Amino acid sequence: MSSKNETPEVEEEEPPEEAKAKGKMPIGGHFNELRQRFTRGIIALVMGVMVAFFFATPIIGFLTAPGGPDFKPAQLGVMEYASVFFNVSLWAGFIIASPYILYQLIAFITPALNRNEKKFIFIAIPAVTVMFLAGLAFAYYVALPPALNILLHWGDDVVLTVVGIKDYMNVVTRILIALGLIFETPFIIMVLARLGVVSPQWLASKRKIWVVIAFVIAALITPTFDPVNQTIMAGPLIVLYEISIWLSKLVYRKKREVSESK
């Protein structure tokens, strides 16, 4: 009776990318990939800051322009302008590197998502970016000039206004970021409608309340009793809410069609 030596078959290891795509990558592999992508993001940020360092002065000039042609903020401390300069370089560098950093983040998480989730991400990111940039443009070209004109000259007959560059940049960046986030309202409400937190009918019933809120926000941005300026500020916010109602109706309709098909 003859016996044959059987050699056990050795399973070949899958490449990391294929294993990840199939959801078979071990925990250690995920940590290694996360570390690599994080390192790439940090390198991109450092390079972005280095590039932005050479453009910090024009950027500061661009941000002070809404104050008017004769406006020139003061340096109230020895290190004040230097602090503003490096902060602007850091944030501008982050903005320059953000597309690559976002790509690294998406590349890490997308293999774990299903088809619908991937589709949502690739639609949502451009939409969110465009809306935020629209908010920044509205703040810079529409909201800031009249707001700064009032704030900088309020009390000229009583006090001498000396505006520090650091204080000025803080006010301007807060208004820019605030309006950039406010312009994300349609997307946020659309997500809430998709989750069933709000409905188109509920949003429509709160329309009058939002009009009041829009004028309150406009009054905070531009503290004046001029109805024209108030309407210019509040108008886009009201339009954003109407867009939110329309988007929520689309989401609700699609959600109903999916449930009926099941």
Swiss-Prot record:
InterPro entries from the UniProt entry: TatC
Highest rank taxon of the organism: Bacteria
Membrane topology value: Multi-pass membrane protein
Subcellular location: Cell membrane
Region (Disordered): 1-26
Transmembrane segments: 42-62, 90-110, 120-140, 175-195, 209-229, 232-252
Family of the protein in this entry: Belongs to the TatC family.
Family annotation (PANTHER family): SEC-INDEPENDENT PROTEIN TRANSLOCASE PROTEIN TATC, SEC-INDEPENDENT PROTEIN TRANSLOCASE PROTEIN TATC, CHLOROPLASTIC-RELATED
Name of the featured protein: Sec-independent protein translocase protein TatC
